[in-house]
């Protein structure tokens, strides 16, 4: 009976002192499609690139457009979703075409009077890059914008590359099912 506390203590100390693999922040880091530049930049080199982008289109703290330009990618235009390329438009407000004051790149709005690129919009484009964060809610317009961009690329014989981002809600799905009489987009 006097050995039991000693055995229990030895057992406890064994597991307290056992070497464990300590997970580092780097091992736990989630990589988005945009983060994996070595996989997609070779596909963009020498091509005229359009990108569907907004403020969520980042690699770390740098906007993907800035990052790609620094790497020599020829970005010929940006397509802007709801809220605009720089995110300075309120929800539901018409967003006009413009020239981005930071990069000088033409920005074509796909929210408001036009929701899909025209043949003319894609005439000087070889490949369209899509990188928008979605939140997994049906009222978010990004998934509808993606579907229309895919249609436009197919109709005009253009390549499209989608840089995926994980759903921040993970595996949680909740909420009412859409009543089809309220469907839009």
What are these regions (language model features)?
Residues 73, 155-159:
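A short helix->loop->beta-strand "cap" motif at the edges of active sites that frequently abuts
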Residues 1-27:
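Bacterial Sec-dependent N-terminal signal peptides
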Residues 25, 83-104:
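N-terminal beta-loop-helix "entrance" segment that forms/cooperates
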Residues 134-146:
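Glycine/threonine-rich flexible loop motifs
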Residues 74-84:
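Short internal beta-strands
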Residues 87-92, 161-184:
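Glycine-rich, charge-decorated loop segments at or immediately adjacent to ligand/cofactor-binding or catalytic sites
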